[in-house]
A protein has these predicted regions:
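A structural preference for long, well-packed, hydrophobic secondary-structure segments
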Residues: 12-21, 42, 47, 59-64
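The beta1-alpha1 cofactor-binding region of Rossmann-like NAD(H)/NADP(H)-dependent oxidoreductases
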Residues: 40-41, 61-72, 105
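Conserved glycine-rich Rossmann-like NAD(P)H-binding loop of the short-chain dehydrogenase/reductase
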Residues: 29-45
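Canonical Rossmann dinucleotide-binding motif of NAD(H)/NADP(H)-dependent dehydrogenases/reductases
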Residues: 2-34
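A glycine-rich helix->loop->beta "capping" turn
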Residues: 5, 53-56, 76-87, 107
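Conserved NAD(P)H cofactor-binding loop of Rossmann-fold oxidoreductase domains
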Residues: 91-96
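Substrate-binding pocket helix/loop in short-chain dehydrogenase/reductase
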Residues: 98-100, 107-110
């Protein structure tokens, strides 16, 4: 029996890529998984994929830059699993769209909001 059995992990940006890989690995160790992601279609696919693997998963559509979305995710996670044991702040964006020289203040603000404020929200 794993030390992670029946523990609950929240993973932001969990619907694909590194986040989904982390969710899969943790779920295979017996953890309950809560995926938070802005992309609801990809989130539904990830939920179905993890469920097929026998992982107990809850997907919550959210924007990491919105504090109320974090609160909703936490409320739903606790309602479903009773407690949150681990948080993986995985959501992030590589850069603003387009060339750096053409990046305006609004685009840089978006990068900072997701990559920095999303972690401390």
């Amino acid at each position: 029996m794993s030390q992670f059995n029946n523990k609950t992990a929240v993973i932001s940006g969990g619907a694909e890529g590194i986040g989904l890989s982390i969710a899969t690995a943790m779920g295979q160790q017996g953890m309950n998984i809560v995926l938070g992601d802005i992309d609801s279609a990809q989130l539904a696919k990830a939920e179905a994929e993890l469920t097929k693997l026998g992982i107990d998963v809850l997907g919550v559509q959210m924007d990491v830059t919105i504090l109320e979305d974090w609160q909703n995710l936490a409320d739903r996670a606790i309602q479903r699993f009773g407690k949150i044991h681990m948080l993986v702040n995985n959501a992030g964006v590589g850069s603003a769209p387009g060339p750096i020289a053409a990046t305006n203040h609004k685009d840089w603000r978006w990068v900072i909001d997701v990559n920095l404020m999303g972690v401390i929200s």
